[in-house]
Amino acid sequence: MFSPRRLAAGLTFWALGSAWCIPALAAQLVRVGAAHFPPYTVRPEQGADTGLLPQLIVALNALQSDYQFVLVPTSIPRRFRDFEQGRIDMAIFENPDWGWQEIPHTAVDLGLEDAEIFVAQREPGRGQSYFADLKGKRLAVFSGYHYAFAHFNPDPKSMVEQFNATLTYSHDSNLLMVARGRADIALVTRSYLSDFMVRNADMAAQFLVSERIDQVYHHYALLRPKAPITGEAFSELLKQLRDNGQMLKIFEPYRIDITPAPRQ
């Protein structure tokens, strides 16, 4: 017969051993869609994304252990289907007005603002009035984007027929078309132009940049209804990144504004 003391010791050892065998609760996997949208996401399908989204994902994962954020490559047109079918849980750097109106989601304000601007070749006598009227001008735009001047209709046929636009999948190509006289105006994000000018400082003097803004990008994260993380929980993580300076570190170099307080 075991003595009470030996029995208690044995039970304690068993309890400790059982606890050691129980694995810690695994972090919940949150799949974030990554569609080519430079400088935010750059060719994610190639597996070496150098954009801002991977930096944000690294910061989110370093901040906590409850969720593991991972990137899932998608595309501008396919991201809607991937979202609805649950292949991705979240789309980041989005706007609810960019074709999401009929798709159930929760919108979380990222507290980030960028802008779409016009860029032309600098010529003697050409000033800001050049951007006032787009009629008759050859435009270079990014295929699939929702532009304010086109009433947010990304249809390629409409862009070509109504706005004499050349559609590409490269902002660099669009800017080079302007530099080489193959297009009159290119539309790019302020953040991308800032990065382009750093990489191509010798070309900066060739371009006339508009004061006119096609649209202001107020960025959101869109969460599907059954996402592993709630809008409130994700908002709290973003707040912590703002408070510890990570948001500023990631986005300020690209002239992406950190707004005073996210609008929820």
PLM feature spans:
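Alpha-to-beta junction loops
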Residues: 66-67, 84-93, 137, 170, ...
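Ligand-binding cleft/hinge of the Venus flytrap
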Residues: 57-65, 109, 135, 143-168, ...
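Periplasmic-binding protein-like
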Residues: 34-38, 113-117, 202-238, 257-264
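Acidic, polar ligand-binding/catalytic clefts
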Residues: 58, 71-133, 146-147, 212
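A ligand-binding cleft/hinge motif common to bilobed small-molecule-binding domains
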Residues: 81-84, 92-103, 184-208, 212-215
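Short helix-initiation/N-cap motifs at beta->coil->alpha
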Residues: 70-81, 164-176
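Extended ligand-binding regions for polar small-molecule ligands
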Residues: 54-64, 124-125, 131-138, 145, ...
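Short loop->beta-strand "edge-of-pocket" segments that line small-molecule binding or catalytic clefts
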Residues: 29-43, 50, 131-148
